[in-house]
Amino acid sequence: MPRRSTYHHGDLKATLVTTALDVIAEQGVGALSVAEVARRAGVSSAAPYRHFASRKDLLIACAITAAHRLTGELRAAHAGAADPGDPVETLAAAAAVYTRFAAEHGSGFDLIYAEELRDAGSQELLDAGRGVMDVLLPAALAVTGEDAKSALQLLERQIAAAHGYAALLRSDFLARRHATVEDVASGAAAIARSLANDARRAEQAD
């Protein structure tokens, strides 16, 4: 019996990216293979290579898509923060969004800034990654008195906490207390709020 395709003619490229992101969500970035994506999409193993010359090219497309999705969710979170005018609350809302995103999609900055993509030479990927930081950085700068180094350090700590929460949830480490995505998102937001308040106090003390 011939294999039935899961895509409509003309949108194979988008289908492959969506399918690849599903694989990443289930198994992680390292598990992604072109062959598995083709199998799930219901096409021949050669079909993806009409759009992506290699696994790396497919991964780049996934990273760009993930960055755009995350940027959109972060923008929405900023607008819906408890106090949109307070950069501390903006950062807390962003941490919650990032945690949900990483928990539900199986990746976050580890895909967008994957080591194997650092020398990819994709301007579109660089722009997509900058787009995420462009959403996060203004609030961090406001908290740290426009000190770029301190702002980046603050974001690094907040993202590390958020990503760590998501990873612990996905690994079932938190299963014994029946933690949910919302539980870890709230935890990440609390840490982000604490770190931002500490940074604000340090800036005001100078």
Regions found by a protein language model. Name each.
Residues 1-11, 200-206:
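N-terminal intrinsically disordered/low-complexity leader segments
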Residues 12-21, 37, 62-66, 70, ...:
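Generic hydrophobic, amphipathic alpha-helix propensity
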Residues 15, 19, 23-57:
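Helix-turn-helix
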Residues 64-91, 123, 127, 131, ...:
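Amphipathic alpha-helical linker/stalk segments
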Residues 75-107, 148, 155-158:
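Hydrophobic alpha-helical connector segments
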Residues 103-120, 167-175:
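Amphipathic alpha-helical segments used for helix-helix packing
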Residues 113, 120-145, 152-156, 182-193:
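Amphipathic alpha-helical packing segments from all-alpha helical-bundle domains
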Residues 159-177, 193-203:
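Amphipathic C-terminal alpha-helical segment
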